[in-house]
Amino acid sequence: MILMPFLLLMQSSDAETYDTLLRCAAFHTIEAERLVRDEGAAAGDAQNATANDFTQTARAMLSEDNDANAVETDLAQRKAEYLDTLAKGEVNEVAAQWTALELACKELYPMLSRINADSISGESR
């Protein structure tokens, strides 16, 4: 009986982590698009690479029975939410959300490093 609430807690945490990964990917994708628009094609490369890392990590969290397009669909939804908020011109809200998001993304960087290291060591075997 004690195991069930623990499992539910773990699922919630995984869902929150998945959502944060996608929000970070959306954030970096939008930043890449802005940099490309403002500074040229190569300027967004680092942001796109970071967005890809977050997206790949989110994809790795999904079980194999999930739709292959689930991550892309979820990512597009998060990105649309951010772009809608930006379009409304709610600058203070965007700044507050993105400051919180930037902190959340920074907390996930160690996980990205571990996953990347594991995948690299798995490829070299």
Where are these regions (language model features)?
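Polar low-complexity intrinsically disordered regions
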Residues: M4-F6, Y18, S124
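Compact alpha-helical subdomains of small soluble proteins
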Residues: Q47-R125
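Short N-proximal segments of mature Sec-exported proteins
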Residues: D14-D67
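Residues embedded in well-ordered secondary-structure elements
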Residues: S13-D14, V94
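Sec-dependent N-terminal signal peptides
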Residues: M1-Q11
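Residue-level marker of positions within ordered structural domains that often coincide
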Residues: P5-L7, T29-I30, P110
